[in-house]
Amino acid sequence: MENSQIIFNKEKATQSILYVANRLERRDLHKIFKILYFAERKHLQDWGMPILGDTYIAMDAGPVPSRVYDILKIVRGDSYMSDTEGLKKMFAIEDWMYVVPLQDADLNKFSKSDIDALDWSVNTYGALSYDEIKEKSHDIAWRSTAKDFAISWESIAREAGLDSQDIEYITQTLESNKSFA
């Protein structure tokens, strides 16, 4: 299952940032990144598909969703891209690292399974400290990837407990879906 087979959903990404940020007490980038990673892993385990389809980079503090990070850098003002989509109307960044949601997430953008996985992740990991969630995110998928490289979806699927047969089925489904896109 190659990362190129997974299609990133920017609309779900922005709504997921809002959804998670509205449910966390500590809304720093690190916490949001990890909550999204665990939600994607859970959804992959339960449904064979990620929610956002972002590319997770193995960084020092754990997996980082690269496109979500790009979105937040646009809002923060340190991106080479400008805010052409009104992202700053959805959320702000304070003190370089805290996400302030300026509206609620549009729940119509999610399936029930998306919301279930996001809620599971918030409920399971939301109260953890920086060090605790960092340690939990330093899983085999993260450890088996070179620093600053993309963690393969196959590694994430294996970390979620899927076996080779499940991964092969998901790969075939993704290929079929791509031909209809």
Residue ranges with predicted function:
Residues 1-181:
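Domain-edge interaction signal
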